[in-house]
């Protein structure tokens, strides 16, 4: 579980970007490459502690491989009563 506010912000940005990329047609391999690049940039910038980056990677990887995060919502069929 993420507790640091800056780490949570990065998590929210990452997951929003991943869903947007999924909706554009990118798939798991592309999402993983995006995540790897994002984490490499965080490591290079030293904006987070290494243990926070590791936690962020674990949580985001778990998010990527949960298929329910990328399902399109299905509208409820309306029943007409006459």
Which residues fall in each region the model found?
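Short, electropositive, low-hydrophobicity segments enriched in small/polar residues
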Residues: 29, 41, 50
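Extended rod-forming repeat segments used as scaffolds/tethers
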Residues: 43-45, 73
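A structural signal for well-ordered alpha-helices, especially hydrophobic packing surfaces
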Residues: 39-43, 64-67
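Intrinsically disordered or highly flexible coil/loop and linker segments, enriched in small
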Residues: 24-27, 48, 69-70
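Acidic, low-complexity, intrinsically disordered interaction modules
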Residues: 46-47, 52
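N-terminal acidic leader/helix
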Residues: 2-36
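Charged low-complexity stretches with an acidic bias
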Residues: 4, 54-82
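Generic L/I/V-rich hydrophobic alpha-helical segments across diverse proteins
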Residues: 18, 35-39, 53, 60
């Amino acid at each position: 579980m993420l507790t640091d506010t800056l780490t949570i912000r990065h998590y929210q940005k990452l997951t929003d970007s991943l869903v947007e990329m999924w909706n554009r047609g990118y798939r798991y391999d592309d999402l993983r490459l995006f995540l790897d690049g994002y984490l490499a940039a965080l490591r290079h910038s030293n904006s987070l502690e290494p243990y926070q980056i590791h936690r962020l990677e674990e949580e985001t990887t778990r998010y990527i491989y949960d298929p329910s995060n990328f399902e399109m919502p299905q509208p409820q069929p309306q029943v007409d009563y006459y």
